C-alpha cells in the first residue's frame, strides 16, 4: 500500500502528540518533588533551542550542564521562515527530565515539517554523576519520516569540575551521525563552562567533524552567555559559526561544503513557583538562504 505525503504528515503528528501524552503521564506517576537546590546551566537553556539540530552544522548540540532544571516536562512549537523560496519550518516538541539517584534521565520528541517533508525525531539520554568532580552523559536518537532527520545519532560527553567552587567545567565528547542518505559524520568536541559568583555563566566549545563520503572536514564553534537565577528567569545569547559538510534539502538533494552562522536568544521565565514559559528567537545564515523565527514552549516542574 502506498502512503501519500499528507498521510505521512498526519501519522508523524499523531505520533508526536501520543508520545508527549505518554511522557507527561509517566512523569506525573513518578511524583518526584523538585530539588530546592536545582539550578539551570547555559547548556540546559541552550538545549531549548530548535535551531536545526537535525543536521550537523554550525549550531553544535549543547551538552548537559552540572546543575540542571530537573523533574520537568515542556511542550511547545516553532515557526521559522526561510528565504530564497525554501519555504517555512513548522513543528512541535515535547521534552522532560527525571532524576533518580545519580542519574538524570531525559527524553525528547520533536515533530517538524521542513523542505516539503515531515517527520518525528525521538531521543533519550542519561547524565550520570560519578563523584563530586566527574559526570558524563550519553544520548541516542532516531526518527520516523522526514529525510532531514537522522536515521541514527548518538553523542557522549565526559565532564570535569575544577577550582575551589567547582566553577570551571571542561568537556570532552564524541559523536556519530547517520543521515538518511549516504552521509555519515564522526565528531570530536572540546568545550568549557565557567560559573561566575554573580548570576553569569559563559560557555564555549568547538567541534571537529569529519563527514563521509569524501572525508570533508567541517569544524564549528559556539559561544553562549547566560544571565539569571533559578525560579526567576534566565536569558541566554548563543552564537555558532563554522563549516557545514552537507545539509539535506531533499531526499536526494543536498547543499555541501559551506560556511554558516547562527544566533539565538532564549528567555526562560518562571510565572508560578513551578511553571513558566520558554521563548526562543532564532537566526541562521548561509550562502544559500537565511532562516529566522521563534519557538514558544510551556514548562512544568515536578
Task: Show the residue positions of the predicted features.
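Outer-membrane beta-barrel initiation region
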Residues: 32-38, 43-123, 127-129, 151, ...
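Outer-membrane beta-barrel "beta-signal"
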Residues: 225, 291-302
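Detector for outer-membrane/organellar transmembrane beta-barrel domains
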Residues: 160-246
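Outer membrane beta-barrel transmembrane domains
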Residues: 144-146, 224-226, 230-276
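Transmembrane beta-barrel strands of outer-membrane/channel proteins
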Residues: 73-79, 107-111, 124-126, 138-142, ...
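Residue-level signature of outer-membrane beta-barrel architecture
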Residues: 96-100, 128, 160-162, 194, ...
Amino acid at each position: 500500500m502506498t502512503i501519500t505525503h499528507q498521510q505521512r504528515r498526519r501519522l508523524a503528528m499523531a505520533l508526536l502528540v501520543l508520545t508527549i501524552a505518554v511522557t507527561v503521564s509517566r512523569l506525573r506517576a513518578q511524583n518526584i518533588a523538585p530539588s530546592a537546590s536545582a539550578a539551570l546551566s547555559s547548556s540546559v537553556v541552550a538545549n531549548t533551542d530548535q535551531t536545526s539540530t537535525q543536521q550537523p552544522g554550525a549550531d553544535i548540540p549543547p551538552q548537559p550542564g552540572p546543575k540542571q532544571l530537573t523533574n520537568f516536562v515542556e511542550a511547545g512549537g516553532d515557526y521559522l521562515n526561510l528565504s530564497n523560496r525554501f519555504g517555512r519550518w513548522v513543528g512541535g516538541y515535547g521534552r522532560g527530565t527525571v532524576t533518580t539517584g545519580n542519574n538524570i534521565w531525559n527524553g525528547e520528541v520533536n515533530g517538524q515539517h521542513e523542505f516539503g517533508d515531515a517527520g518525528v525525531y525521538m531521543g533519550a539520554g542519561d547524565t550520570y554523576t560519578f563523584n563530586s568532580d566527574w559526570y558524563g552523559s550519553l544520548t541516542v536518537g532516531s526518527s520516523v519520516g522526514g529525510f532531514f532527520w537522522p536515521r541514527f545519532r548518538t553523542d557522549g560527553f565526559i565532564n570535569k569540575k575544577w577550582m575551589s567552587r567547582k566553577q570551571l567545567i571542561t568537556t570532552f565528547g564524541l559523536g556519530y551521525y547517520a543521515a538518511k542518505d549516504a552521509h555519515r559524520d564522526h565528531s570530536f568536541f572540546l568545550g568549557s563552562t565557567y560559573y561566575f559568583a554573580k548570576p553569569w555563566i559563559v560557555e564555549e566549545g568547538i567541534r571537529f567533524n569529519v563527514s563521509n563520503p569524501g572525508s570533508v572536514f567541517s569544524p564549528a564553534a559556539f559561544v553562549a552567555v547566560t544571565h539569571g537565577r533559578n525560579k526567576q528567569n534566565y536569558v541566554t545569547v548563543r552564537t555558532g559559526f563554522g563549516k557545514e559538510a552537507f545539509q539535506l534539502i531533499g531526499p536526494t538533494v543536498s547543499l555541501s561544503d559551506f560556511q554558516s552562522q547562527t544566533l539565538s536568544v532564549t528567555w526562560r521565565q518562571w510565572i508560578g513557583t513551578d511553571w513558566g514559559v520558554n521563548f526562543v528567537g532564532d537566526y541562521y545564515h548561509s550562502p544559500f538562504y537565511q532562516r529566522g523565527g521563534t519557538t514558544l514552549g510551556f514548562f512544568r516542574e515536578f
